């Protein structure tokens, strides 16, 4: 009585089978809420734009594609995205590949291990970092003295902010990368995320309207004070036996840039935990009155989607909002 009887499926008419297949597709389409599907589409578009900008492989060998995903999530982590956002984008990438009948690079050991490290370092409750704005920098500069550390830090902050530089680009600068003129300075980035071949990307920084906050004058003052004529622009400063400060030949680390930005925030009574080295770059893009075309030239973004990803909710209430241009 309790014997298991083998099951022989009945053959369905072709019309019935097709009807069930169509119903299954309909159920699949309704398996996710509209806002979830929209979020995944947005996440996929961001990933696609990044991959195209970086010229990275999306198909072929699974390990190569996994390396692409690793580079992408590392970029997100370094750009102060929340862990929850990075995880959601991995899901979006996975779903897109699996929908095409391909193995998901998001599920490879390489990607899972890197994501594990990101969670440990950033924490699952991390908030996106705040942009550093002109008003913050102006208040900070008023507190500075004329000592060598203040001179260096002022130049670092102003050049980083005006040039929309990544912290890795700032500390990699050499004197030979600077070309001064009566209009400002051309800074050549020898290698960056969007220039892996090292062809060089020129970035222009013009003289400011206020001498106390002019990035070009601050840079000139630092080079002159430090008697720096070649080699690294931004260098470590150590205490000497006489109790003074000595500029070393050693290049400043990108971690030091983050520390200086956090010190700036604390000095002007902001929460340093909300800021990072990336706050200079995001602050430039968030605040600039330049057109998107010129802003993207300065930040060296090739993708409008990636560039617009820097915009914060507060930007929705800026004076350029079209609701304020209606004469109401």
Task: Give the residues covered by each predicted segment.
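Extended, non-catalytic subsegments within catalytic or DNA/protein-binding/adaptor domains
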Residues: 1-328
């Amino acid at each position: 009585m309790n014997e298991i009887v083998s099951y022989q499926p009945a053959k369905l008419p072709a019309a019935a089978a097709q009807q069930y297949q169509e119903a299954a597709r309909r159920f699949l389409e309704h398996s996710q809420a509209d806002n979830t599907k929209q979020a995944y589409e947005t996440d996929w578009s961001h990933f696609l734009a990044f991959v195209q900008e970086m010229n990275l492989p999306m198909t072929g060998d699974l390990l190569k594609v996994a390396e692409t995903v690793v580079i992408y999530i590392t970029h997100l982590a370094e750009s102060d995205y929340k862990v929850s956002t990075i995880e959601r984008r991995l899901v979006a990438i996975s779903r897109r590949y699996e929908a095409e009948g391909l193995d998901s690079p998001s599920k490879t050991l390489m990607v899972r291990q890197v994501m594990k490290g990101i969670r440990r370092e950033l924490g699952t409750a991390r908030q996106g970092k705040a942009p550093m704005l002109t008003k913050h920098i102006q208040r900070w500069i008023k507190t500075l003295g004329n000592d060598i550390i203040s001179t260096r830090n002022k130049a670092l902050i102003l050049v980083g902010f005006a040039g929309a530089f990544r912290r890795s680009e700032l500390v990699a600068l050499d004197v030979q990368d600077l070309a001064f003129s009566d209009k400002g300075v051309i800074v050549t980035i020898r290698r960056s995320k969007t220039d892996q071949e090292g062809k060089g990307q020129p970035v222009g920084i013009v003289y400011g309207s206020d001498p106390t906050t002019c990035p070009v004058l601050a840079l000139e003052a630092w080079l002159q004070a430090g008697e720096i004529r070649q080699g690294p622009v931004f260098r470590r400063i150590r205490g000497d036996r006489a109790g003074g400060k000595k500029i070393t030949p050693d290049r400043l680390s990108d971690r030091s840039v983050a520390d200086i930005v956090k010190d700036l925030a604390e000095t002007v009574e902001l929460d340093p935990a909300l800021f990072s080295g990336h706050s200079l770059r995001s602050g430039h893009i968030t605040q600039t009155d330049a057109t998107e075309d010129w802003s993207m030239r300065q930040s060296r973004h090739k993708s409008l989607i990636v560039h617009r990803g820097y915009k914060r909710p507060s930007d929705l209430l800026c004076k350029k909002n079209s609701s304020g241009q209606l004469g109401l």
